[in-house]
Amino acid sequence: MKYFVVALTLAVAFVCIEECKTVEIGYAVSEDFDQNEIDNDEARQAFKTFTPDWNKIRNDAKRMQDNLEQMKKKFNLNLEEARQAFQTFKPDWNKIRYDAMKMQTSLGQMKKRFNL
């Protein structure tokens, strides 16, 4: 029961602190609006008259796409070919085992020869 009371007290304290912060922030924001004399109608008008520069946006997108194409050509990237190559890759495990055994034999001979 003690833990429940402590937890409840902490929860209430946390809510009170958060509410105080909200009130302080709201008061500070309203003070700023009063100081700068920002009118809601002015803000609406400014928002309505905002027009993004669509030509610049299109040109930037086209430039980025061209850069991507140049990188693909430069590094010879073809994702579909890479996927196919990865899916069809089948290592020759017999050759790998044979090479590993040869290397192990050579290593054993070197140990004997150099007394390692």
From Swiss-Prot:
Residues 23-44, 80-83 form a propeptide. Disulfide bonds: none annotated. Keywords: Pyrrolidone carboxylic acid, Secreted, Signal, Toxin. Its main location: secreted. Pfam families: Latarcin (PF10279). It is found in: Secreted. A motif (Processing quadruplet motif 2) lies at residues 80-83. GO terms for cellular component: extracellular region. Cleavage of the propeptide depends on the processing quadruplet motif (XXXR, with at least one of X being E). The modification Pyrrolidone carboxylic acid is found at residue 84. Belongs to the cationic peptide 03 (latarcin) family. 06 subfamily. This is M-zodatoxin-Lt6a/c. It comes from Lachesana tarabaevi.
